A protein has these predicted regions:
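A short, structured active-site edge motif that brings together acidic residues
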Residues: 81-92
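A short acidic, helix-capping loop that chelates divalent metal ions and anchors anionic groups
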Residues: 53-58, 91-97
């Protein structure tokens, strides 16, 4: 896989980025882990996630972060092989500190 620079960060990422929005529902954790491992094994090192990604069952006040938890569990022993792009894009609870 040919890697490309990510802006001026010095990071090199694959031209393909694996999105994780559906991790949780409809993609259960065991399948999501298999997908992540297959991507890493094939040279995809760029993973996109967010604090609100948990599949299609998201609702206001739900804790969110399911996809981030799955990604973390799946790559904990391969952390040096992955560039994780995450973002905070919406409240995950009703309170100002949520």
């Amino acid at each position: 896989m040919n890697f490309r620079p990510l802006g001026a960060s010095g990071l090199l990422v694959s031209p393909v980025c694996l999105g994780t929005m559906t991790f949780g529902t409809p993609v259960p954790q065991n399948d999501a882990v298999r997908i992540l491992h297959a991507a890493l094994d094939r040279g995809v090192n760029f993973i996109d996630t967010a604090n609100v990604y948990e599949g299609y069952n998201r609702f206001l006040g739900s804790p969110g972060g399911v996809a981030e938890e799955i990604v973390g569990a799946a790559i904990h022993d391969r952390r040096d092989k992955a560039v994780v792009a995450t973002k905070v894009c919406a409240p995950v609870g009703p309170g100002p500190q949520d």
